[in-house]
Amino acid sequence: MKHLDNLIDDLKKILGENLVTVMIFGSQAHVEPEKLKSNINLMIILEYLSSDDLKNTSKVLQKWVKAENPIPVIMSKAEWYSSFDVYALEYSDIKEKYKIVYGQDLTGDINVDKHYLRLQCESELKNLFLKYRNHYLMKINSDREMEKVANNVIKTLLVIFRGVIRLHNELVPESSEYIILQAAKFMEIDTELLIRMANVRDGKEDYKSKEIRK
């Protein structure tokens, strides 16, 4: 992908030897390079991270975001190694699905304690319920806004479900449908509803008029 190659070249020029790693994580990590177009999650790891580094890279990263990509995660090497407990869900996902596009591969050192993974699953689920209730109150009269809320809900639930599956030492399926079905072995969830929500988010189905408000 030209945009990605250009970004890496710019980061190398700006950061020099301070740039340790650039990696793709998430759903795009296993996509062939020529098919990468947008919505690419990047993690940028530096040996040391200062306010000057943020300032100096802001312009090229803003350009990257304007090309319809999420804001990259940027951190120091020390932060990377000290965050396995706080971001247990995220590191579990990264370890399973990533691609190094520049520099060192630090993922072999990822060690996620199941205690912290369980705690984050519980915390994220409770926070999701609270946020959803608030959004429901504020967006209930708009099908379009409620669909956005539902898409965000299922996106977060799938992350949590992957964590739950890993807690039980099972492999995480690729498709949203099978992730939901696998998680249902360990949780009481409405698989039919959740699969429908996932299909709508993935563009496979559409909600009927006012269905999203129920």
Question: Predicted regions span which residues?
Answer:
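Metal-dependent nucleotidyltransferase catalytic core
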Residues: 1-14, 30-37, 42-87
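Active-site palm subdomain of RNA-directed nucleic acid polymerases
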Residues: 15, 19
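Short gly/ser-rich loop at a beta-strand->alpha-helix junction or flexible surface loop bordering the NTP-binding
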Residues: 20-28
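Conserved NTP/Mg2+-binding pocket subregion across the NTase superfamily
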Residues: 54, 58-148
